[in-house]
Curated annotation (Swiss-Prot):
This is Structure-specific endonuclease subunit SLX4. It comes from the Eukaryota. Residues 612-622 have a biased composition (Polar residues). The gene is SLX4. Residues 562-573 have a biased composition (Basic and acidic residues). The keyword DNA repair applies. Forms a heterodimer with SLX1.
Length: 788
């Protein structure tokens, strides 16, 4: 039977190829189904528990339906529209994030749910203390209160992490001040800001403790770790208890033993304890603070000698720092000037400087201190003639201390004190060299005769400096010299031979005194510098210019040049070149002295740079004879005689006639005004007011007699008469002013706008139109320009 079936199957396979293809397709489908089942079984172990199991059943049913379906062509289904990813509201975002899908209204029903919802929203907007803890610490100083330094708080107190508006404003201001160069992206990064703050804190710690720094300079400049005590210093430097108390290695006994040798000062500032206040002042010393700081205080010992026994009297050691004092406006000649600046704080009160009474003054001698700023070397020189010094305090200042009184009681006997007839006087002098004092006197006063010189001279071969005295100067000695004065400056390097005597402001009775010589050279008399303005004019044709007077400020020089020959083949001759002087060219050079300030200003304001030496080409007019233009302008007296005797503004009859004509112009019609313009030869304008204004201004330059005569004459004759009268009036006023006359005679172009303003504001008092001025200049051959 099996054999029969095998034969039947083989017959089927060989029966038709179509049947064989269908069979292979079914076999492939069955294999795919088996593979799909195996894959599903493998993926079941990854299936979620809550997932509905209907999905697998649906897949199996779909596979069965696909088997039964015919292989017919079906239309593709349309894709479903995608849901728009819209921005969710804040409440929905909070519900999904913190409320686990529950609506906010459902949570409101129970108190616990409502509290959880609020805390969840607060936690979303709250900051994290582990990230901005450093910023909160800095906000404490702004708010002046402390925050809790606990770690992550409990849920009940979660709302305390929220920041108020003031807190956030302070944080933003703090960040912008500390980090002004942050970009918009890094400004919101709290981690970046926290790292920056930590770096700055570390740098501040390094600067406060330079030994922590690895640089050699920071380690070398750092103070020692351990400070020496008084016992350590006493053992290290073999000091006594007295030296430890006084903080100095100089003792009074050392000064008494050796008068000539100056002891040295040992400073222990690097190893001394710095806990003591620097502002405290020892009672035994009177310290005056200086406005300009010095490297270290200078110890100075004051010495004086008795006139009889010449016994040295050591006063005491003082730390002296000069301070500018307040002077009275009225001085008696026993004080000195101080050129130092005022300091802010006063180290010693005025009570520490008691004024010496007149009966207790004693004569003390001294030399002037000479200190070099570079190496503090002091040179001892022979005492020269004492110099006069003015003071501003009514009484000298005595430096009082316990050591001074103690020194006086030990070394000075009562008999020596009684031998003095006058009291001692102590004056602190300014450290100025004796050879360079007051070499340039500028003023002398009567009180300068009885002026004491500086009683101290500083001398020492090494630092510190001490004062030593060499000689005794009595109080009644005259120390006023010819070369010194109360008011003076630094030493001048000019020779005395070139100085000029200065008359004294006060009259002295002493006939031996001479005039004070000034070290400044004699002032030379001021010589006014002459300024000349030169210009050149190039004129076609021959022009003859008469020689002017040598005393005149205007000099005209004619330079004759020949015209270059014209090539008749290549160039066409101009009609203007034909004439008598067709082969000549005149160049006029005008030199005028400029002595007025207005002339210089006008030359600088000239926009065409006519103040420079330039060449201006002026073509000759064929209607006017240019052979002697300059002479006709300068020597024309006929025009002056025609109107020189008339006074327009001062004649009452003329003023009345003008007033009548002014009224007549206002009453005239436009037609009559145009006829008057034509009669006078004026250029017609538009507007009745403008016509009345021009006629009124022009009428000021025309006499009434000429107006009456012109009415009987024909049109051309009347125009010529009025025009001549107007031009003569303008020429009369121009010849009265030297500035305009020089310009016209030197062929310099005049500005019509400036001439118009000058005629309106000057003696003429007439504001003419530029057209009339242009015709006037053209008529008389005056060069002009209309540039404003």
């Amino acid at each position: 039977m099996s054999r029969l079936t095998e034969d039947s199957i083989g017959d089927i396979n060989l029966a038709s190829t179509q049947m064989q293809g269908r069979l292979e397709e079914f076999d492939e489908i069955s294999k795919e189904e088996e593979n799909m089942k195996k894959r599903i079984e493998r993926l079941r172990k990854f299936k979620n528990i809550d997932t509905n199991t209907n999905h697998t059943i649906g897949l199996q049913n779909e596979n069965l339906e696909n088997k039964n379906k015919d292989t017919s062509i079906t239309k593709p289904k349309r894709r479903s529209k995608r849901d728009n990813n819209r921005i969710k509201s804040l409440t929905s975002l909070m519900e999904e994030t913190y409320n686990k899908g529950k609506s906010f209204q459902e949570l409101k029903q129970s108190k616990l749910g409502q509290k959880d919802a609020q805390l969840s929203i607060f936690q979303y907007f709250s900051g994290h203390k582990e990230k901005i803890g450093d910023i909160l610490k800095r906000i404490e100083s702004i708010e002046k209160r402390k925050l809790e330094s606990s770690d992550v708080p409990e849920i009940e107190h979660e709302s305390r992490i929220l920041y108020t508006k003031k807190e956030w404003t302070d944080i933003i201001k703090r960040i912008r001040l500390r980090f002004p160069e942050l970009s918009s992206r890094t400004k919101k990064s709290l981690k970046y800001i926290t790292n920056k703050i930590q770096i700055q804190n570390q740098s501040q710690l390094i600067s406060e403790y330079p030994k922590n720094n690895s640089s050699i300079w920071s380690q070398a400049s750092a103070p020692p770790d351990t400070e020496f005590t008084d016992d350590d210093l006493k053992w290290l430097y073999d000091l006594t208890s007295e030296q430890i108390i006084n903080e100095s290695t100089i003792l009074q006994n050392d000064l008494e033993e050796s008068d000539n040798e100056t002891p040295f000062v040992m400073t222990l500032s690097q190893v001394m304890n710095t806990t003591k206040s620097e502002d405290t002042i020892d009672r035994e010393f009177d310290v005056i603070s200086d406005s300009s700081p010095e490297p270290s205080p200078i110890r100075v010992s004051f010495c004086c000698r008795d006139e009889q026994s010449d016994k040295a009297l050591h006063l005491s050691e003082q730390k002296i720092q000069v301070k500018n004092s307040i002077y009275d406006p009225e001085f008696n000649g026993n004080e000195i000037f101080s050129h130092q600046k005022d300091s802010v704080e006063t180290a010693v009160s005025i009570e520490s400087f008691p004024f010496v009474q007149s009966g207790q003054r004693e004569s003390i001698t001294g030399d002037i201190a000479e200190i070099s700023e570079d190496n503090f070397q002091v040179s001892e020189t022979a005492p020269r003639q004492p110099q006069a010094i003015h003071g501003t305090q009514e009484a000298p200042i005595e430096i009082s201390s316990s050591s001074i009184n103690r020194g006086k009681t030990n070394l000075m006997s009562e008999e020596d004190r009684a031998s003095h007839n006058e009291a001692e006087e102590v004056i602190i002098s300014s450290p100025i060299k004796d050879s360079e004092l007051f070499k340039t006197p500028t003023k002398r006063t009567p009180g300068s005769k009885n002026i004491m010189s500086s009683p101290f001279r500083l001398h020492c071969n090494s630092s510190p400096l001490s004062i030593r005295s060499n000689s005794v100067t009595p109080r009644h000695e005259r120390i006023v010299s010819e070369e010194s004065s109360a008011y003076s400056t630094a030493r001048s390097k000019f020779k005395l031979s070139s100085a000029q005597p200065i008359p004294s402001q006060y009259q002295f009775d002493d006939s031996e005194e001479e005039a004070i010589f000034s070290s400044m050279p004699a002032r030379q008399a001021y010589k006014k510098r002459k300024v000349y303005h030169t210009s050149r004019l190039l004129i076609d044709g021959g022009l003859y210019v008469e020689l002017m007077n040598e005393n005149s400020k205007v000099k005209i020089k004619t330079i004759e040049t020949k015209r270059q020959p014209v090539d008749s083949e290549n160039e066409i001759r101009d009609s203007e070149d034909e004439g008598e002087h067709d082969n000549s060219l005149s160049v006029i050079e005008i030199t005028r002295e400029v002595d007025d300030t207005d002339d210089l200003v006008n030359l600088g304001r000239n926009p065409r740079n006519e103040n420079d030496t330039s060449v201006l080409q002026v073509p000759s007019s064929p209607q006017i004879d240019n052979s002697n233009v300059l002479g006709s302008l300068y020597t024309s007296q006929a025009a002056d005689s025609a109107f020189g005797s008339e006074k327009i503004l001062e004649d009452p009859i003329r003023s009345n006639a003008l007033e009548l004509t002014q009224d007549e112009f206002n009453n005239m019609s436009t037609k009559d005004l145009k006829a008057k313009f034509q009669e006078w030869g004026l250029k017609p304008v538009k507007g009745k007011e403008k016509m009345i204004q021009i006629l009124s201004e022009t009428n000021k330059l025309v006499s009434q007699s000429q107006l009456n005569d012109s009415q009987d004459k024909p049109m051309t004759a009347s125009q010529h008469t009025i025009k001549t009268n107007i031009y003569n009036r303008i020429s009369f006023h121009l010849k009265q002013d030297q500035y305009w006359l020089d310009k016209i005679l030197s062929f310099e172009p005049i500005n019509l706008c400036m001439l118009q303003e000058w005629l309106a504001s000057g003696s003429a008092g007439v504001k003419l139109e530029t057209d009339i001025l242009e015709k006037y200049c053209d008529e008389l051959g005056i060069t002009y320009t209309d540039i404003k």
